[in-house]
Amino acid sequence: SGYSASAFLKDQIARGELSPADVAQLTQAATRFGLGSLGFSAFMAVHAQYLAGRPEADYIANSERLFRRAIARLIYPEARQLIEAHRAKGHSIAIVSSATPYQVRPAAKDLGIDDVYSSELEVIDGQFTGRVVQPTCFGDGKVLAAETFTEAKESTLADCFFYSDSTDDIELLEAVGHPVVLNGSRQLRVIARERSWATAHFTSRGNASGSQIFRSLAATGSLVGSFLLGLPLYALSGSRRDSINFSISLFAETASALIGLDLDVRGREHLWNHRPAIFMFNHQSNADMLIMASLVRRDIVGVGKRELKNMPFIGPLMGAAGVVFIDRSDRTAAIETMRPLVHALQEERKSLVIAPEGTRAPTRKLGAFKKGGFHMAMQSGVPIVPVVIHNSHDISPKGDRIFRSGTVHVDVLPPIDTSDWTTETLQTHVTDVRNTFLRALAQPELSVEETLALEEHTPDDLKPEVRGQTNRQRPGRKTNLSDDDPEQMLQAPVIKNNQPAREQNNGAPEATRH
């Protein structure tokens, strides 16, 4: 959904790499290309000149950052389903794109696609020369790239599916045996009807409708309403705990209904068999708070970033519900702030809900775990219950402004005994617990050494302590609610896909072997 080139251009402007005159020249070139008076290779050359002398390694690192920040959320969940459907049939998959590899490869890596064909920029001695490698992967060049792929797989284009939304790809659509027009332009849809090509339309990304926005605002407001409705219970019973439990359950039911969120839960019995417990969940989405409220329901405390405390209405309500706000940029202060949670676990018999990653992951890949929750488990002696959330990223990916209605699949795993844990063995236990998540998510497990290396090499934009420092340094900045507000409740259509003949053109395969 959308164009990765836009994210790159906006980033270059924001970083001061393009002057107003440069932007004007690029805009003029894009306009001429759109009108057909400038060829694709010439259009690419206009942009490539601005990279001359720049180290490729820096551009690669920046492209990966941009993917995490702005592009990952654009990948259609239906596209992921489609890719898996092709894999299940034993098909080989490639991305064949006119974009540069720096736009395409991060998405390919996230999707598990090794074969990438794109328009290359010339690099000598690790630096861009400002020239484009010919031929570019456009028009007949894209056909040539697809033929290279099929030859390597000992197949032919006649066996291939190819998915596209643009008439720019008409040459390859005509060359393959199974052309599919996906979210096609009006002109391409007309051509598809004339030639009896398969068509499909994905709807789970894009602009929210008025109805979706209204329902989302209502769901967000239901948090306030749910706690207000709990006040009469508190007045009558005098029990703050019963009032909060009532409000949490009411919020979970109301907001889920408004959003259209359903949960498919395996191992639900583990939510209740060993309380109090520390419920650890992998953090993918703004929807996770609602999901955990729906699952755990009562007698809970939580941990949230300090920035949430100052949010109007939401912050005070979260504090009243037992959320402890921590300063992610100050490890010592964070540990001190969390000490009362041991009392809540041991004396008040409340359970702790915590995301060991410390921040939302931009993709489905499990991030590095922080040790705070594990220290809490060791000090309190309560078990850890892993809650594996499979696809809340589909419902509302990091950085998105809306929620999508649909079904989230959750595995609640058996409790893990922590009574014999020690400081000396803690890293081993962290690795073991993280590997239980990885197994459930069908991702490769890591050794202790590999787990430590992952923590060390986690990019700064995925480290909550670094993000916290950034927020402290810029206290007056305007907050991007889609990045910082886990209370946003927006929704969109249910994801349904049963056929391996659907795909999308941004971050998804464009050629597959049948």
Regions found by a protein language model. Name each.
Residues 1-35:
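Active-site neighborhood of HAD-like aspartate-dependent phosphohydrolases
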Residues 24-27, 214-236, 251, 258, ...:
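A hydrophobic membrane-anchoring feature enriched in long, contiguous, low-charge segments
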Residues 42-77, 254-255:
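Metal-dependent phosphoesterase signature
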Residues 55, 241-268, 298-347:
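Membrane-interfacial amphipathic helices and adjacent loop/beta segments
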Residues 61, 68-230, 239, 474, ...:
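C-terminal cap/substrate-recognition subdomain and adjoining C-terminal extension
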Residues 107-112, 118-124, 234-235, 258, ...:
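Catalytic core of membrane glycerolipid acyltransferases/transacylases, capturing the structured
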Residues 235-282, 286, 291-294, 448-454:
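N-terminal signal-anchor transmembrane helix
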Residues 335-514:
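Non-catalytic C-terminal accessory region of glycerolipid acyltransferases
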